[in-house]
């Protein structure tokens, strides 16, 4: 029987099991199965996945993120805010501004601290990737994939594709609560045009500075929030002329609000909370 200490944290209800790999050890070959086991709501702790906080050669810390199906993702906005909170509060970093390595690249985090506790985290998510090759999508073309039609159940849905280090398909609807989240979501997620699968967001524009947001996450299904998805939604809204670049946009997710801005300089900034749920020790056994 093996075990490790964990901290369960969430960003707007998007929860992960966080493991400090400066102190703990999980064999590389076991990571996918452990992520699947620990995320199980019935036989594990229950979460949207597992995130490892690891040493890095190029930043103070490195984030590795696993979905609840065991697949490894390249980035996670809500996860990055929680990693930033954990790293500062556990003295893995000293400054309130620091970098985090991800599989999608290095991002910059800035934490707001009150009485020694991080109350808010802002992440510079870098520039969005907009071409088919960068997203990635099948097909040729170096222009952005904006408002292209997808036929489902005899209804045409127009979506815009954006990568924030992971792929997103953003669909505008009149009412997110009536959107085909659990039906169209998995169909588009696993469509052959996305070789690495895709996260699917449904967006309802409220005004020039606010939107409602629902998400079907690649490898996890319906979640309360998706930070990279919120960033992709704002980028897609600006590309479609629905919002203005440079302004801070309030994204209303099922789990709460994020503040997102696509700056004139090109990077996307995400600001929001990160909270600890519980801490403990998880025991597991890998069958031979």
Swiss-Prot record:
Subcellular location: Cytoplasm
EC nos: 5.1.1.7
Record-level GO BP terms: lysine biosynthetic process via diaminopimelate
Principal subcellular localization: cytoplasm
Pfam families: DAP_epimerase (PF01678)
Family: Belongs to the diaminopimelate epimerase family.
Its biological purpose: Catalyzes the stereoinversion of LL-2,6-diaminopimelate (L,L-DAP) to meso-diaminopimelate (meso-DAP), a precursor of L-lysine and an essential component of the bacterial peptidoglycan.
Alphabetical list of NCBIfam families matching this protein: DapF
Quaternary state and interactors: Homodimer.
Protein name per the record: Diaminopimelate epimerase
Organism from which the protein derives: Bacillus cereus (strain ATCC 10987 / NRS 248)
Lineage: Bacteria, Bacillati, Bacillota, Bacilli, Bacillales
Gene: dapF
């Amino acid at each position: 029987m093996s075990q490790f200490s964990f901290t369960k944290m969430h960003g707007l209800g998007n929860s992960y099991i966080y493991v400090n790999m400066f102190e703990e050890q999980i064999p590389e070959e076991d990571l996918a199965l452990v992520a699947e086991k620990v995320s199980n709501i019935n036989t594990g702790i229950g979460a949207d996945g597992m995130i490892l906080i690891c040493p890095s050669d190029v930043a103070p810390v490195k984030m590795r993120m696993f979905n609840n199906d065991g697949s490894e993702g390249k980035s996670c906005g809500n996860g990055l805010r929680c990693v930033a909170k954990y790293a500062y509060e556990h003295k893995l970093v000293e400054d309130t501004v620091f970098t985090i390595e991800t599989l999608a690249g290095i991002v910059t985090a800035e934490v707001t601290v009150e009485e020694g506790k991080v109350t808010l985290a802002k992440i510079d998510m870098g520039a969005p990737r907009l071409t088919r090759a960068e997203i990635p999508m099948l097909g040729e073309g170096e222009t952005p994939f904006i408002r292209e039609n997808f036929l489902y159940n005899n209804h045409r849905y127009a979506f815009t594709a954006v990568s924030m280090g992971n792929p997103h398909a953003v669909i505008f609807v009149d009412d997110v609560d009536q959107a085909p989240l659990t039906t169209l979501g998995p169909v588009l997620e696993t469509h052959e045009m996305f070789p690495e699968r895709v996260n699917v967001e449904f967006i309802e524009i409220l005004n020039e500075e606010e939107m409602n947001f629902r998400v079907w996450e690649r490898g996890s299904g319906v979640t309360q929030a998706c930070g990279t998805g919120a960033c992709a939604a704002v980028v897609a809204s600006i590309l479609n002329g629905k919002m203005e670049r440079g302004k801070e946009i309030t994204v209303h997710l099922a789990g709460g609000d994020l503040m997102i801005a696509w700056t004139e300089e090109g990077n996307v900034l995400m600001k929001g909370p990160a909270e600890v749920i519980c801490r403990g020790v998880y025991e597991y056994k890998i069958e031979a």
